[in-house]
């Protein structure tokens, strides 16, 4: 057992023995002063003779005091006991006005003002069976509302104090309320919780779990508003602005210095133009230019108009393969785009290989035209702008070669509805997927789609 515990137990026993001796002497004193001399002598022979310390204390108290100490404290206790609200309302014994005022003042005392009603020192036992268990003035279960144990523990936390119904009937403003902590101070009971630190942790919750807002202010800043907050742009829980939702229309360009969210790798840069929701951003940004689009065709818009990087194919449409349309050199309607698409190609010995055809972009007003593909490469189909049923350059005219320099060419037309056709008959014995029969079926499907667009 630790030495401190042993010392406390010894002090408790010594204090209890002293209290018993004093009580015995005060009883003998009370009997002497009230005229019960025979009873006092009998009490002395039976009790004080076995306890010399109590007899000595009784002799000293009788000589030094002309009044009974026990009687004085009993009168004080009984006055306060009778003035308690639950007893005075029931019409009990009379009490003084001072005792009534004492109870009213103790009820209205704010929490934390212990005064001399604080709990006794550690180690002193409470006489739970005695009416004046608490400090010799209050009945069992009665404790001033302001009397609190060290550390702010309410009286109900001690098993020796049963719950007081009067304290339960107290108004909310009279209860032991805890004021809110000042700014920057820790919350009560929040000690020991994880405290993540690092860049992007704006709020100092002092022990409470914090959320890392990307792009937030440095530590010490206020909480970030959520989307819809008036007077501010708002912040989403992941730190992105409302117009920067991933893969959604009108997606903005994220800042270059934005840290990754939850350890995820940064997303590749995308263009500021809108794209369908949920569509990947594998393509490079396209340069938009002013051009007239054919009716029903999905095109990239002019300046200020969001251009479509890709479109969702409609029912019955043919999947897109490696194809592109290239405008004339210096034409502002040309679109620079670089696609890497594997394409099947037949060599002279009949073996099938995969060749990646890289079509370099052509910008408006810069550089030379794209060189024609090799003779063995499959040519792409070009659709030239115009109106339905127009001359060469209309949506119904199809060229089997790249047509640079044509004034009526419209490279902004939708390539999804124009599958590529073979530039010529395949060599004998080849297993080309685009044979004559397949070309005929594809032509029928293409004509049906074009008729549906132009209808």
From Swiss-Prot:
Involved cell autonomously in PLM neuron pre-synaptic differentiation by negatively regulating prk-2 expression and in neurite branch positioning. Disruption phenotype: Defects in PLM neuron synaptic differentiation characterized by a misalignment of active zones and synaptic vesicles, branch point anterior to the vulva and overextension of synaptic branch. DD motoneurons display similar pre-synaptic defects. Increased expression of prk-2. In addition, mutants display a moderate uncoordinated movement, a small decrease in body size, a defect in egg laying and a slower growth. This is Single-stranded DNA-binding protein homolog sam-10. Ubiquitously expressed with higher expression in the head and tail ganglia, the vulva and PLM neurons. Its main location: cytoplasm. One of its GO terms (biological process) is branching morphogenesis of a nerve. Residues 217-249, 281-302, 314-343, 357-442 are annotated as: Disordered. One of its GO terms (cellular component) is cytoplasm. It comes from Caenorhabditis elegans. Residues 19-51 form the LisH domain. PROSITE patterns: LISH (PS50896). Keywords: Cytoplasm, Neurogenesis, Nucleus. Residues 288-298, 321-336, 407-421 have a biased composition (Low complexity). Residues 396-406 have a biased composition (Polar residues). It is found in: Cytoplasm; Nucleus.
């Amino acid at each position: 057992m630790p030495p401190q515990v042993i010392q406390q137990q010894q002090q408790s026993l010594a204090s209890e023995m002293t209290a018993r001796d004093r009580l015995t002497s005060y009883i003998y004193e009370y009997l002497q002063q009230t005229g019960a001399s025979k009873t006092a002598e009998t009490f002395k022979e039976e009790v004080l003779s076995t306890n010399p310390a109590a007899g000595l204390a009784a002799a000293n108290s009788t000589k030094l005091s002309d009044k009974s100490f026990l009687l004085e404290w009993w009168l004080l206790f009984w006055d306060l006991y009778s003035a308690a609200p639950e007893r005075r309302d029931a019409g009990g014994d009379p009490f003084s006005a001072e005792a009534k005022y004492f109870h009213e003042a103790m009820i209205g005392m704010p929490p934390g003002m212990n005064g001399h009603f604080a709990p006794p020192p550690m180690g002193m036992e409470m006489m739970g069976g005695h009416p004046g268990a608490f400090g010799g003035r209050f009945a069992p279960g009665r404790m001033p509302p302001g009397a609190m144990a060290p550390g702010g523990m309410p009286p109900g936390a001690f098993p020796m104090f049963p719950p007081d119904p009067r304290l339960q009937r107290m108004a909310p403003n009279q209860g032991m309320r805890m004021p809110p902590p000042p700014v920057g101070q820790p919350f009560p009971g929040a000690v020991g919780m994880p405290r993540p630190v690092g860049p992007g942790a704006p709020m100092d919750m002092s022990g409470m779990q914090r959320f890392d807002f990307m792009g937030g202010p440095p530590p010490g800043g206020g909480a970030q508003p959520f989307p819809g907050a008036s007077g501010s742009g708002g912040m989403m829980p992941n730190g992105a602005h409302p117009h920067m939702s991933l893969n959604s229309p009108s997606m903005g360009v994220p800042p270059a210095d934005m840290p990754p969210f939850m350890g995820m790798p940064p997303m590749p840069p995308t263009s500021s133009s809108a794209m369908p929701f949920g569509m990947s951003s594998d393509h490079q940004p396209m340069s938009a230019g002013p051009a007239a689009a054919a009716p029903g065709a999905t095109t990239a818009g002019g300046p200020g108009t969001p251009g479509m990087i890709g479109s969702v194919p409609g029912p019955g449409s043919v999947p897109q393969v490696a194809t592109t349309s290239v405008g004339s050199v210096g034409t502002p309607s040309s679109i620079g785009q670089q696609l890497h698409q594997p394409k099947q190609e037949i060599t002279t010995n009949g073996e099938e290989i995969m060749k990646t055809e890289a079509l370099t972009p052509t910008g408006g007003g810069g550089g030379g035209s794209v060189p024609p593909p090799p003779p063995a490469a499959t040519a792409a189909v070009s659709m030239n702008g115009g109106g339905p049923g127009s001359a060469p350059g209309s949506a119904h005219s199809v060229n089997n070669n790249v047509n640079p320099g044509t004034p009526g060419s419209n490279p902004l037309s939708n390539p999804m509805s124009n599958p590529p056709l073979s530039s010529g008959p395949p060599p004998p014995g080849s297993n080309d997927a685009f044979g004559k029969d397949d070309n005929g079926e594809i032509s029928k499907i293409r004509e049906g789609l074009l008729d549906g667009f132009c209808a």
